[in-house]
Amino acid sequence: LGDVYKRQALSIVQQLCGHIGRRVEYVIDGEVLTVDCLMCAVCNGRAYGGGFMAGPEAQPDDGWLDVFIVRKVSRRVIAKLLMLYKNGQHFQNGQLTEAAKPYFIYRRAKSVSLRAADDRGPIIATADGECAPCEQVRVEVQPLAGRVLLPQPAYQRFTAKKAAVK
């Protein structure tokens, strides 16, 4: 197992040993949701944390964020959800799978902000493996804000796919 995967697995174990879940207020493209949840993943790519397929259909170049909120569940249910989530089996063909619907909320958005809606202090946000306590987190799409370098074979597949869509 890689180091990133080990750190992600350790983080999950640490979370399971403590208080599970938070009440969080989300504003997703203006829609306000207050949810008792375990976690939220805001994705513009398919995987993170050594292979967790959080956003199995998320694309970095489509101008959208795929937002997955995992509702608060018992420890007993977490193992089942973890395998769905890790393998990307919670989302197929643009929607949550039947197995995931009771436990996940999905939205497609241009902007997402969230903040704790309980009295347990700041939210712990993770980006690229770095964790930090945050009073509020905001993520939004910034078209053409970055450059991505691809190896030649990947670039050829990318341009061929774009040409086929037109």
Positions of the model-derived regions?
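Glycine-rich phosphate/pyrophosphate-binding beta-alpha loops
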Residues: A41-P56, C131
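Glycine-rich, aromatic-lined ligand/substrate-binding cores of catalytic
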Residues: S11, L38, Q59
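Active-site-proximal catalytic alpha-helix in oxidoreductases
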Residues: Q14-C17, L38-G45
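A transmembrane-helix-recognition feature enriched in membrane-embedded lipid enzymes
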Residues: K6-H19, K80-Y85
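Short, small-residue-biased leader/transition segments that mark boundaries at the very start
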Residues: L1-Y5
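ATP/nucleoside-binding phosphotransfer catalytic cores, i.e., glycine-rich phosphate-binding loops
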Residues: I28-D29, T34, Q59, I69-K166
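Interdomain hinge/lid region at the active-site interface
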Residues: D62-L65
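Glycine-rich, charged/polar anion/phosphate-binding loops
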Residues: A9-V13, G21-D29, G50-G55, L96-A100, ...
